[in-house]
């Protein structure tokens, strides 16, 4: 009688992601098409394996003051408590309060891409976010503190050798403020994350990077808790303008 193998199941998850990214790299010649296909691989993985309270999409993020982020390759956002998500001509617009994490997704990591990803992440973190007191039977709970928005980078390969070595560390440490990248994956090599306790990046070279990254992301999202109660009327004021 055959038996299940958890090790094989976890390995298969990574192998599927790596194989799909590899096919994209080899098959599509147009950079734009290749980029879109790479984003779709990561979005599909997150939508499949993250708890259903989360959803992933390529999107812009907007705040109640009318400010927009740059276009973000992969946004992980709340779908359970978000009162509205705009979709117009296949473009998705997500309120800033609903965002848990944002990622830049490309085929290959290099210094330019890391800096570009940091600016993309900063464009989301700079947005204004509201948080309302929460009503209950006996009154109201204080407004929930805003959760940190995770920023990250998702690629198949790296221009550096070693892929997760000093060159990547230098690029990541160039921006540890609004643009800080908290977590990322180079699917052919390993994953990384920013360790708050040590104030430094941790790098892991491994055989199943996509799976390890997914588990680490889920763990970080668990610590994020739930997004705050959005002030819908702050957005509604734009109906009169």
UniProtKB/Swiss-Prot annotation:
EC identifiers of the protein: 3.1.-.-
GO biological process: defense response to virus
Keywords linked to the UniProt accession: Antiviral defense, Endonuclease, Hydrolase, Magnesium, Metal-binding, Nuclease, Nucleotide-binding
Active site: 73, 104, 106
EC class: hydrolase
Site (Binds cAAA): residue numbering on this chain: 53, 81, 226
Disulfide pairings: none
Keyword RNA-binding in record: no
Binding site for Mg(2+): 73, 104
Pfam families with a match to the protein in the record: DUF6602
GO MF annotation list: endonuclease activity; metal ion binding; nucleotide binding
Names of required cofactors: Mg(2+)
Ways its activity is controlled: Activated by cAAA and to a lesser extent cAA; both cyclic nucleotides are products of its cognate CD-NTase. Cyclic nucleotide binding causes hexamerization.
Family: Belongs to the NucC endonuclease family.
Domain notes: Second messenger binding causes a series of shifts that enclose the cAAA molecule.
Subunit structure: Self-oligomerizes. Forms homotrimers; in the presence of cAAA the trimers associate face-to-face to form homohexamers. The 2 cAAA-binding sites are on the exterior of the hexamer at the three-way junction, there are maximally 2 cyclic nucleotides per hexamer.
Main function: Effector DNase of a CBASS antivirus system. CBASS (cyclic oligonucleotide-based antiphage signaling system) provides immunity against bacteriophage. The CD-NTase protein synthesizes cyclic nucleotides in response to infection; these serve as specific second messenger signals. The signals activate a diverse range of effectors, leading to bacterial cell death and thus abortive phage infection. A type III-C(AAA) CBASS system.
Protein name: Endodeoxyribonuclease NucC
